[in-house]
Swiss-Prot record:
EC main group: transferase
A Gene Ontology molecular function term of the record: rRNA (cytosine-N4-)-methyltransferase activity
Chief site of localization: cytoplasm
GO cellular component, one term: cytoplasm
The protein's name: Ribosomal RNA small subunit methyltransferase H
This enzyme's EC code(s): 2.1.1.199
Organism from which the protein derives: Francisella tularensis subsp. tularensis (strain SCHU S4 / Schu 4)
Compartment(s): Cytoplasm
Keyword field: Cytoplasm, Methyltransferase, rRNA processing, S-adenosyl-L-methionine, Transferase
Reactions it catalyzes: cytidine(1402) in 16S rRNA + S-adenosyl-L-methionine = N(4)-methylcytidine(1402) in 16S rRNA + S-adenosyl-L-homocysteine + H(+)
Length: 305
């Protein structure tokens, strides 16, 4: 079953205008979209998703005149708004980052290190390289870098060397459990978390360009949102959250150069573009009991001035 994490908190913090225009940057199974639509009267919602399964689900279950689903990465939101004359007209954006429960639970998608399936990991199966192909094509140094930076894996080089050696001997790694067991054999189980967790996260981020897409969205988000509009971001790991926090913070407290003569910071409020609505919120105990995956979720909400 799919749970939308921090659902009520994020929707409440968006302060929905019933006549407004909203964007769900990560449709998934439509939990946040449904909650927004329930609060709209003459307003409308545009949702984005790279996953064809999510697109099919939306077309079958969200047949509303004020709803549109777009098969695209949220990195293309600016271009979409430009093409449809919506720049500066969006009342709110919600983004629920990372992989969804249906993607994790379906072994055939290749995201799970506990259920065997093809080592794919693409959110959009219509294009791009699979995780299996990435392991074959990347050098030891590149693979090590991905594990270290995207997965924060301290044994990155050791795992990368073992993987490339295994591929040289066996031709490829085609199954998720094949990779998970290889990682376990390389570094052992030293903590409660599955030893494959970080490498699977890193590979998924690389295959789907997740952090680059997030940076592209945030780079242009001010041009999309209207004054008084709000942005809600839910992240599930420190890399995503760091990007969100740093971007929001830079627009709330912009770094300014000291005046060389007065040695004082210029008081230029025009450089301040956002204000915090929710600096940091986490799932409460009731939600944690319902959905263990919500334990790492962090919600941050800002408003455009």
């Amino acid at each position: 079953m799919h749970y939308s994490v921090l659902l009520q908190e994020s929707i409440n913090d968006l302060n929905i205008n019933p006549q407004g225009i909203y964007i769900d940057a990560t449709f998934g199974r439509g939990g946040h979209s449904k909650a927004i639509l329930n609060r709209l009267t003459t307003g409308r919602l545009i949702a984005f998703d790279k996953d064809l399964d999510a697109i099919s689900y939306a077309r079958e279950n969200f047949q509303f005149s004020n709803f549109e689903i777009v098969h695209a990465s949220f990195a293309s939101i600016y271009d979409y708004c430009l093409q449809h004359s919506l720049l500066g007209k969006i009342d709110g954006i919600i983004m629920d980052l990372g992989v969804s429960s249906p993607q994790l639970d379906n072994a055939a998608r290749g995201f799970s290190f506990t259920h065997n399936g093809p080592l794919d990991m693409r959110m959009d199966v219509s294009k791009g390289i699979t995780a299996s192909q990435a392991l074959e094509e990347l050098s030891v140094d590149d693979l090590s870098y991905i594990f270290k930076v995207y997965g924060e894996e301290r044994f990155a080089k050791k795992i990368a060397l073992r993987i490339k050696d295994y591929i040289q001997q066996n031709g490829s790694i085609r199954k998720t459990l094949e990779l998970a067991e290889l990682i376990l054999a390389t570094i052992g189980k030293k903590e409660k978390k599955n030893p494959a967790t970080r490498c699977f996260q890193a590979l998924r981020i690389y295959v789907n360009n997740e952090l680059k897409d997030l940076e592209a969205l945030l780079e242009n988000i001010l041009a999309v949102i209207k004054s008084g509009g709000r942005i809600a971001a839910i992240s599930f790991h420190s890399l995503e959250d760091r990007i969100v926090k740093q971007k929001f913070s830079a627009l709330i407290n912009p770094k300014q150069e000291l005046n060389r003569i007065t040695k004082m910071l210029p008081q230029d409020s025009s450089q301040i573009k956002l204000k915090w609505i929710t600096k940091k919120s986490k799932a409460n105990e009731d939600e944690l009991n319902q959905n263990v995956r919500s334990r790492s979720a962090i919600l941050r909400v800002v408003e455009k001035l």
